């Protein structure tokens, strides 16, 4: 199973992809989406959305977990 984890934030959104096979889990990719405070809100949200969509398209997770 492939899981995309997201730690949401407007200035910095962290993400990571793990893959599990049986009892073995490994990190496949991770990163941080940084947006600038002086950019309009809609542009910042658009950047976050676009990069999360890229991760979903590339890694095709079966589940997504979002930190509360």
Region spans (language model):
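Phosphate- and other anionic-substrate recognition elements at nucleic-acid/protein interfaces
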Residues: 1-68
């Amino acid at each position: 199973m492939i899981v995309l984890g997201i730690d949401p934030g407007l200035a910095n959104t962290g993400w990571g992809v793990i893959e599990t096979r049986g009892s073995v889990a490994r990190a496949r990719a991770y990163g941080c989406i940084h947006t600038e405070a002086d950019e309009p809100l809609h542009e910042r949200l658009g950047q976050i959305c676009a990069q999360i969509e890229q991760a979903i398209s590339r890694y095709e997770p079966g589940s997504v977990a979002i930190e509360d």
